[in-house]
Every structure is written in structure tokens, then in C-alpha cells.
């Protein structure tokens, strides 16, 4: 059983995001870039399935500029068998990402595709669903538990009413929630081994996919600064303050 894991590079979640002076985007030059936390969980789950003897190969893939090879080596150090780097300097929106992953699916013929339910840079939560639709295969999103047996994946997901369990035939697409697992710690020997693992490089144009934006963001702006809070002694003073501001 082969598992393909989508493994996106994003601005590290500890970085304080700065908007460019012209409002055209956020500053990414010189800031720390890290694997998308949801995709790390997806990779960890794929590795656990391999550790159990259910999967035989885990392939990690990313769509990113040429300098993202270190990012993929991180995935190889976690334990992936090999990596695929689809190179493009253009921003890739969810639909283009799904189309690119579909090309990799057609090339690799995986039994399962796992990716994070969303990326923390855009929070779109669209790529997995779009890939499943383009592929014509079942999907199970927001997975908090995954079991694979007899050509089926049983996925538990958290919904507003409690827990929901889905059973889907393989091949399928699964997107992961934060509660699914805790990614493993990468040890130094694993980092050294990753340097010799296969890493295939493809150009996005080779796959016949255009990275052009279907959705254009006209401008970016930081959140408006909040005004200083006002302390009140009791409910009556609170009501008076709200009336003064025209809120009541």
C-alpha cells in the first residue's frame, strides 16, 4: 500500500506576520518557514500506518519554489521513503494545488492520499475536497482517528453533534485534524539518512498545470488597532457607557 502525503511549507506559526507597505501581501523574505502543522500530522499518520505494516511506502510531496528542498528533507527525516518537489515560483491556490496533486496521483497511483485539513497561511480548507472531486474518489475530512483494513479506511471525525464515523473505499483522500496524533521528534541520525533518500524534482509546467490565481486578493491590511479599554465599577456604569457610545 502506497500513501502520498501533501506537505506544504508555510510561514512558521511563531512568526509575527507583517503586511507589506504597499498592501500587496505579507512579508515572507527573511522569515522562518516551516512545515504546515496539519501536514506534519498527516505525514505522522502515514508513517504510523507504515510502522504497523499496513503501508509499504510513504511519498511526501510539495509545490514550492526551488529553495524548498530542505523542507522536503525534513519530511524525509521524519521517515518518508522518498519525496517529490514540484517547482514553481508562483503562489499556488487550492484549486491549482489540487490539480497538481491529481497529476501526482495519476503518476504514483497511491492507495491513500493524506493531507492537512487546511494550511495555516490561508486557512482555506479546500485542497483535499477539490482533489477528491477531481480524482472521483471518496473523501473523509477532519480526521481525528484513522484505521485502514481490507481495502477500506474508517475515519472518525469531530462534528458539532459529537463524533461521526465514516467508512470509505480505497483509494481515497483523508484530511487530518490536530487531534489525530502528535508528530514524532526528528533525531540527528534521521536527518543524516534523509540526505541520501530519493528526491524527485518536477517543474509545474511539466505537469500541464498553471499556477495562475483564480481568486485575486486586491489588498492586505493588518487588523485595526483596538482602542483603550474603559474600566467600569458596576452594571449601571456599563449601561451608561454603552448608551453614551450609541450601542444601546
Where are these regions (language model features)?
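N-terminal glycine-rich FAD/FM-binding segment characteristic of electron-transfer flavoproteins
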Residues: 1-248
Amino acid at each position: 500500500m502506497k500513501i502520498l502525503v501533501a506537505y506544504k511549507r508555510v510561514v512558521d506559526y511563531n512568526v509575527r506576520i507583517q503586511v507589506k507597505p504597499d498592501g500587496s501581501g505579507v512579508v515572507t523574505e527573511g522569515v522562518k518557514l516551516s512545515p504546515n502543522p496539519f501536514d506534519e500530522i498527516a505525514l505522522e499518520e502515514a508513517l504510523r500506518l507504515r510502522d504497523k505494516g499496513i503501508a509499504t511506502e510513504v511519498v511526501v510531496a510539495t509545490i514550492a519554489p526551488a529553495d524548498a528542498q530542505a523542507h522536503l528533507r525534513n519530511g524525509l527525516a521524519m521517515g518518508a521513503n522518498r519525496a517529490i518537489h514540484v517547482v514553481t515560483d508562483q503562489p499556488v491556490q487550492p484549486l491549482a494545488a489540487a490539480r497538481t496533486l491529481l497529476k501526482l496521483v495519476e503518476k504514483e497511483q497511491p492507495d491513500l492520499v493524506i493531507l492537512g485539513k487546511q494550511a495555516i497561511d490561508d486557512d482555506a480548507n479546500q485542497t483535499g475536497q477539490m482533489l477528491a472531486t477531481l480524482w472521483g474518489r471518496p473523501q473523509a475530512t477532519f480526521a481525528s482517528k484513522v484505521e485502514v483494513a481490507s481495502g477500506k479506511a474508517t475515519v472518525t471525525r469531530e462534528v458539532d453533534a459529537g463524533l461521526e464515523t465514516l467508512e470509505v473505499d480505497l483509494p481515497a483522500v483523508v484530511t487530518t485534524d490536530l487531534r489525530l496524533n502528535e508528530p514524532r521528534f526528528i533525531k540527528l541520525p534521521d536527518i543524516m539518512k534523509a540526505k541520501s533518500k530519493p528526491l524527485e524534482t518536477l517543474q509545474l509546467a511539466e505537469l500541464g498545470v498553471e499556477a495562475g490565481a483564480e481568486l485575486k486578493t486586491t489588498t492586505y491590511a493588518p487588523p485595526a488597532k483596538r482602542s483603550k479599554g474603559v474600566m467600569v465599577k458596576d452594571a449601571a456604569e456599563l449601561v451608561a457607557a454603552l448608551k453614551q457610545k450609541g450601542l444601546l
